C-alpha cells in the first residue's frame, strides 16, 4: 500500500494520478473514476488495471485522492494478479504499486 501527501490540490493531484497511470506501460488501462465533494473537501477514486505477462493475469490498482484545494493525500493499493490455487502473484502487485509511486514522484508529487 502507498500513502503520499503533498501541498497540491485534489483536482491537480487527480490529474497527476491519471498521468502516472498512463505512463505505466502499454498494458495499463484506467478502468474508472468517481468522486465526491462536500464543503471544501473532495475525494476521488481512480481504478486501473494492468496485464502482467509473467502471471498471465491482470492486477488492479485502486487509488484514492483526498483533501482540499491546497493539499492532498494519495493512497493506492494493488490487488488481484494471483495465479493458481495458491494465488501466487510473483511480485506483480508490489511492482505495480512501486511503479505507480515512482511515476507520481517523477511528476512532482512527493
Listing of model-derived features with the role each one plays in the protein:
Residues 1-26, 33:
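Terminal, regulation- and interaction-focused segments at domain boundaries
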Residues 21-28, 81, 108:
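A common structural junction motif
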Residues 33-36, 51:
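Short, solvent-exposed loop/turn elements at beta->coil junctions and helix N-caps
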Residues 39-40, 52-54:
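Acidic pyrophosphate-coordinating catalytic loop
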Residues 41-48:
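Short, hydrophobic/aromatic-rich segments at coil-to-beta transitions
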Residues 83-110:
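A conserved amphipathic terminal alpha-helix motif
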Amino acid at each position: 500500500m502507498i500513502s503520499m501527501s503533498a501541498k497540491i490540490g485534489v483536482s491537480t493531484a487527480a490529474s497527476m494520478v491519471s498521468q502516472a497511470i498512463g505512463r505505466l506501460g502499454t498494458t495499463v488501462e484506467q478502468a474508472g473514476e468517481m468522486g465526491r465533494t462536500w464543503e471544501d473537501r473532495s475525494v476521488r477514486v481512480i481504478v486501473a488495471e494492468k496485464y502482467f505477462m509473467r502471471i498471465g493475469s491482470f492486477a488492479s490498482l485502486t487509488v484514492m485522492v483526498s483533501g482540499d484545494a491546497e493539499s492532498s493525500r494519495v493512497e493506492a493499493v494493488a490487488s488481484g494478479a494471483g495465479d493458481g490455487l495458491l494465488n501466487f502473484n510473483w511480485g506483480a502487485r508490489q511492482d505495480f504499486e512501486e511503479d505507480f509511486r515512482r511515476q507520481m514522484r517523477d511528476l512532482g508529487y512527493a
